[in-house]
Amino acid sequence: MDKKNIDWANLGFGYVDTDKRFVANFKDGKWDDGVLTEDSNVVINECAGVLQYAQTIFEGMKAYTTEDGRIVTFRPDLNASRFADSARRLEMPVFPEDKFVEAIKETVKANAAYVPPYGSGATLYVRPYMFASSSVIGVKPAEEYQFRVLTTPVGPYFKGGAKPITIKVSDFDRADPHGTGHIKAGLNYAMSLHAIVTAHAEGFDENMYLDAATRTKVEETGGANFIFVTKDNKVVTPKSNSILPSITRRSIMYVAKEYLGLEVEEREVFIDEVKDFAECGLCGTAAVISPVGKIVNHGEEICFPSGMDEMGPITKKLYETLTGIQMGRIEAPEGWLVEIK
């Protein structure tokens, strides 16, 4: 298939309208079969539950062109499972996980001309989402919902390579101990906007959120999980019931152990011990791994030995191995890559 006439090398990380998107509706207690449509507009009632009470969830994933020319997605079954968990928490109907994966495949296939070529550094970002579409005036779950999948080609998250970033320990809380921090709900991200705008105004790239109960333990940023590397090369990631279970983080921990032979540990990480780590990174779909060079905790600077010039050596190996798997340069574990045919 011929690709669209897009300057892939200079593609930004933003929205580009593509040819098709998938739409399914939940009404009278059941989902319809769903269809592909060319219409990118969503028309809903002014009193829709999504507008009144933020009843909406989403996922983020990518489709890639591999070294041998295949179009693949990365572990969509895990996105389907997490999406179902998010729906249950917000009292929304679960979109069947098998149909979720099929909708992803169908939408990517319909927009194959927008999947950037191998070696361009660009990918096709895939955004499944669901929202309450029927009117609600009292505080209660809606009765009707819409599930959609949109795609948009995006350039690399970091132009010219991933340079270490500087983050601050935030005075804001991202999630309550028994709240919604473990799901991918739109309301979580809306709550983080003021904090990230404030951080940017102060010259920082991101926020480090601590646990709301004690403010002593590391949780995550507004949209990425933390990974740390000890001075003896152990890969550590924070454990908390209010952290979003990142698919990228889960994959990185597997790669660290099974591909690189490193010791891994998921545990509570206290802010007081962060200064003792050798490397730090943020992991998520957008950038895979973003290296962190410095954390500022209310005037105290924590500078990692890996520095501000480039990724630390272990972080770099993790990044290169995982992206190698995603792009087909390194053999993937069974089921990780789903080919779009």
Give the location of each predicted region.
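Extended, Lys/Arg-enriched charged tracts that mediate electrostatic binding to polyanionic substrates
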Residues: P117-R127, F131
